[in-house]
UniProtKB/Swiss-Prot annotation:
Tissue and organ distribution: Expressed in hyphal bodies.
Compositionally skewed regions (Low complexity) per UniProt: 63-78
Region called Disordered, residue ranges: 1-165, 178-209
Protein role: Polymerizes chitin, a structural polymer of the cell wall and septum, by transferring the sugar moiety of UDP-GlcNAc to the non-reducing end of the growing chitin polymer. Contributes to the production of conidia and the ability of fungal conidia to germinate. Involved in fungal stress tolerances.
Membrane topology per record: Multi-pass membrane protein
Entry similarity comment: Belongs to the chitin synthase family. Class II subfamily.
Keyword Lipoprotein: no
Protein name (Swiss-Prot/TrEMBL): Chitin synthase II
């Protein structure tokens, strides 16, 4: 390979200066540990009187201007005497072609300085490389061919490429080693403190300021070849971070560090005028989240120049999700923050609206977080490796809190996005919990620790993997701004359908898409009209922080919400333990039923969020077990506690609506409890209708044979489902669960065929009448047509009918699996309450600790800025290479498993006997031939139709209220005046519309 020519004099290795007045510990910030970056000039050439004159700090440059006079030659070595080396050939001509006959140049730098002509300065100060086309920012070595996959970032907005005068020749430059290494953080010369203008790859210019006037063809290229290195070689440019012990002062007895950000990240930041942009703040929290404020911990938003009011506090919880899921959510959040800042006419938001928004990322367990997710956080500047400690003065650290205001974002393709793509600064808090303590504990850190320190107005909860729409968070916040009675709100959760809807080819994804759509069209609008939404999904929901607070006695929504975290073992009965699997349902109930208040919950249709739904059977069953058990027991809890509504400050009309909703929920609860028997009986009567020889479409009694086979298959399959659910995990019996769902699909297909055949035969029969009454036409055709027809009508009413054509068939085929597989597995595993804390109470020591006496401690930290840069470079390289992470082994069984299993047995036996008695009794009373005279079938079908009509009425009311609100708000905004020719009649109409709008809002 071609090697570059060597410099004409030995390199100079200088030590960085730490005498910056802002970097030394002060009384206000005694624990500040700030490492010198290459952007802080440690040399001053104004005086040569003393050796220390060169160590005086210079004002930090705020432009990124390559040098036009500084050479690549380094100053004299720190050695007393330079090594004696032969001078280079005087015939050397820069920028000339190399030839084999040219004289060989020495390998080491010469002790003499040879004067060479300088090439003309380049008009382009930056490579024309798109920062967004690479998963990592570039380094200056890419100009020299050192790493072609690392392009330079675009020029910052404040740079001036045209400024090439000598007055600014040494502004923001740094020397680059020309040995092909990727390590761009070389020693600084006496003429520059940052990056130089790259020259020809095969040349090394001296300090001459002459322009290039020789003929380039006279240049002779010299080839250098050396021996191949022996043994395994590390990656070129990779430098292992070096740690050294430092003494720092504690703040209020706690470890708080201000650490400079990596050099590469600093190089393309548009804003560098505040510490929040140039330094990452680390706090080692050694207390419980409830004592965070009392112990004197602070966040940047409550100290110094960054003291601000927080209007919106966003929580993103994660466990072990990879970098793709994290960046999908984080980039969407940053685009939403940009939307807040784009609302220039808003009284709350505007250009600096980002200062009122704080994003808190909470990871559940330091050993559980995905390593690539940590790399993504490091790329954004909010995380640095080697800073955290396990204990401070023998006190165990409970959480590691990193704070930084980032100006870059990573999209789902791991491409950098900055101000050129509309990204605005974002205040980040990254809380890395030391132990794995479940999502509920993460919310306790969010509400009781950080929320108490910031006192926000609205809190938004997001799960990693959920991608909110570009303006969804604004609409969610607006619901609280327009109605002071709203305590909680949620948006529409959509299933992620993939590119061109490719994910819908999976029947499991398509069925969930249909289920989500029906819930967002029928259930959520109905509950929003009543004012009580049974569950605000944690994937995309918001709460008013003031409404969540407990009363003076300590009782309130948050106390009940976090009660589930303190329940352990036999001290918590199975009912309470399962109820707190859906703690978000308990929080919704406690808000609406809060004593002396009139809080309501609202559904915001314009707020949407996409989430990836399970696409495999084991993950799907495990997810629904928690949902179904939590929903069932939480519904029972709210129905038992219905008297709490009387102690609220709701109006009489609102209380009546809430009690109507309780009746509706009670009916739904009964149908859920007996859903297994209802499915079997529906199959028994509908499919059994083809056993009649006069109705049999196949003839020769084939319909009776098929029904008998499917009937026994269904009974055996249900029994097998109990055995599977009691003894096997879904992950350990994938094929059995998949086979059972396929067989249920076959049974549902035959039942649907029988139903359609009976309907067609009834409609085409000449002797049949279509009168409404106790007959097949009324009981079967009208009831089923009304149910399915309402689905179509309401979907078209909301202008979202596509799921009826793309996902309805898959949903109806998998409907028996929803009932039999999911319900059976959920009830058979009521003992499985995942606490997530077994074996995680050992204090780790892998990070080291901060040990000392008094207010000063000693700890290991990166030695210099180069070590911070090395960690950042490694994180970017990991993201670029997409390094795989080995999976973790399966965890052990949870504590108190034997106790919960004993209670589970009684629960399952009672439920199975109740459904069995109902199924056997009805099947014995009614034959399988008289569908028109079957009272039970008629009751089931009409009950389903009635519930659908009730949901449709609520959904229609919701739509009407929205239309009226839009009309009223439009009239106010446009300031429409009633024409004078309408006289007093027009003013009466205007007053009537306003009163109707205000009454509907209340």
């Amino acid at each position: 390979m071609d090697r570059p020519n060597t410099p004409s004099r030995p390199p100079e290795y200088t030590l960085p200066s730490y005498e910056d007045e802002h970097d030394t510990p002060t009384g206000q910030n005694p624990a500040a540990v700030r490492l010198l970056t290459s952007f802080e000039d440690p040399f001053d050439h104004s005086s040569k009187s003393s050796p220390r004159a060169n160590l005086r700090p210079r004002t930090t440059r705020r432009s990124y201007q390559p040098s036009v006079v500084s050479s690549h030659s380094r100053s004299a070595s720190v050695l007393d005497e330079a090594p004696s080396m032969p001078p280079p050939d005087s015939s050397y001509v820069p920028f000339a072609h190399r030839e084999t006959s040219s004289p060989h140049r020495p390998w080491t730098p010469s002790s003499r300085v040879s004067e060479f002509s300088r090439p003309p300065p380049s008009n382009v100060s930056y490579e024309p490389s798109d920062l967004n086309g690479s998963p990592r920012p570039g380094t200056p070595s890419s100009r020299y061919g050192g790493s072609p996959r690392r392009p330079l970032p675009p020029a910052p907005l404040f740079s001036n490429p045209g400024r090439t005068s000598q007055a600014f020749a040494d502004d923001a430059t740094v020397s680059i080693p020309l040995d092909g290494s990727d390590d761009v953080f070389g020693p600084e010369t006496d003429l520059s403190d940052s990056r130089p203008l790259p020259t020809h790859r095969d040349s090394f210019m001296s300090g001459s300021q002459e322009t290039l006037n020789e003929d380039a063809e006279d240049y002779v290229k010299v080839e250098h070849y050396g021996p191949a290195p022996d043994g395994a070689q590390e990656r070129r440019g990779v430098r292992a971070p070096q740690m050294s012990k430092k003494e720092v002062q504690l703040i209020n007895g706690e470890l708080v560090l201000e650490c400079k950000i990596p050099t590469i990240l600093y190089s393309f930041l548009p804003r560098r005028n505040e510490v929040e942009f140039t330094h990452m703040r680390y706090t080692a929290v050694t207390c419980d989240p409830d004592d965070f404020v009392e112990r004197g911990y602070n966040l940047r938003q409550s100290i110094g120049r960054t003291t601000r009011e927080t209007e919106l506090f966003i929580c993103i919880t994660m466990y072990n999700e990879d970098e793709i899921c994290f960046t999908r959510t984080m980039h969407a959040v940053m685009k939403n923050i940009s939307h807040f800042c784009s609302r220039s006419r808003s009284r709350t938001w505007g250009e600096n609206g980002w200062q009122k928004i704080v994003v808190c990322i909470i990871s559940d367990g330091r050993e559980k977080i995905h390593p690539r997710t940590l790399d993504a956080l490091a790329a954004m500047g909010v995380y640095q490796h080697g800073i955290a400690k396990n204990f401070v003065n023998n006190r165990a650290v409970q959480a590691h809190v990193y704070e930084y205001t980032t100006q870059v974002s990573l999209d789902a393709d791991l491409k950098f996005k900055g101000a050129e793509k509309g990204i605005v600064p974002c205040q980040l808090i990254f809380c890395l919990k030391e132990k794995n303590s479940r999502k509920l504990n993460s919310h306790r850190w969010f509400f009781n620790a950080f929320g108490k320190a910031l006192n926000p107005n609205v809190c938004i909860l997001l799960d990693v993997g959920t991608r909110p729409g570009s303006n969804s968070l604004y609409h969610l916040w607006k619901a609280f701004d327009t109605d002071s009675n709203v305590a909680g709100a949620c948006g529409e959760i959509k299933a992620m359908k993939g590119r061109f809807g490719s994910n819908l080819l999976n029947p499991l994804v398509a069925s969930q898409n249909f289920e989500y759509k029906l819930s967002n069209i029928l259930d959520k609008p109905l509950e929003s009209v009543f004012g009580y939404i049974t569950v605000l999904p944690g994937a995309l929901s918001a709460y008013r922080y003031h409404a969540l607070q407990n009363d003076e006695t300590g009782h309130g929504p948050l106390s009940q919400y976090f009660k589930g975290e303190t329940l352990h073992g036999q001290h918590a009965d199975v009912f309470t333990a399962n109820m707190y699997l859906a703690e978000d349902r308990i929080l919704c109930w406690e808000l609406v039923a809060k004593r002396g208040e009139r809080w309501v919950l609202k559904y915001v249709k314009s707020c949407t969020g996409e989430t990836d739904v399970p696409d495999a059977v084991p993950e799907f069953i495990s997810q629904r077990r928690r949902w179904l058990n939590g929903a069932f027991f939480a519904a029972v809890y709210s129905l038992v506690q219905f008297r709490q509504i009387l102690a609220t400050d709701h109006t009489i009309a609102r209380k009546i609506l809430l009690y109507i909703e309780f009746v509706y929920q009670f009916v739904q609860l009964l149908f859920t409890y007996f859903s297994l028997a209802n499915f079997y009986l529906t199959f028994y009567f509908v499919a059994g209708g083809l056993t009649d020889k006069t109705v049999d479409p196949f003839g020769h009694n084939i319909g009776s044979v098929i029904f008998t086979i499917l009937r026994y298959t269904c009974v055996l399959l249900i029994a097998t489902q109990f055995i599977l659910s009691l003894g096997n995990r879904p992950q350990g019996a994938k094929k059995l669960y998949l086979a059972s769902m396929i067989i249920y699909g076959v049974i549902m297909t035959y039942t649907s065929f029988a139903c359609i055949y009976i309907v067609v035969r009834q409609l085409t029969g000449k002797s049949q009448d279509f009168a409404i009454g106790n007959n097949v036409f009324t009981n079967l055709i009208v009831s089923m047509a009304s149910t399915i027809g309402l689905y179509f009508v309401m979907s078209f009413l909301y202008l979202e009918p596509w799921h009826m054509f793309t996902s309805s068939l898959q949903y109806f085929l998998l409907l028996p699996s929803y009932i039999c597989t999911l319900q059976v597995y959920a009830f058979c595993n009521t003992h499985d309450v995942t606490w997530g804390t077994k074996g995680d109470n050992v204090i780790k020591t892998d990070l080291g600790g901060a040990v000392g006496k008094g207010e000063t401690v000693e700890l290991e930290m990166p030695s210099e800025q180069l070590d911070i840069d090395s960690g950042y470079d490694e994180a970017l390289r990991n993201l670029r290479d997409r390094l795989a992470v080995p999976g973790s082994p399966v965890s052990e069984a949870q504590m108190q498993e034997d106790y919960y299993k004993s209670v589970r047995t009684y629960m399952v036996v009672t439920w199975m006997i109740a459904n069995g008695i109902l199924a056997m009794a009805v099947s014995e009373i009614y034959s399988n031939k008289g569908i028109g005279d079957n009272f039970y079938l008629r009751f089931i079908l009409w009950a389903v139709a009635s519930l659908a009509i009730f949901r449709a009425l609520g959904s229609t009311t919701f739509a009407i209220i929205n239309v009226v609100n839009i009309v009223v708000e439009g009239r106010i905004r446009m300031n429409v005046k009633v024409p004078s020719w309408m006289g007093g009649f027009g003013s009466k109409i205007s007053e009537k519309v306003s009163s109707v709008g205000s009454s509907l809002k209340s």
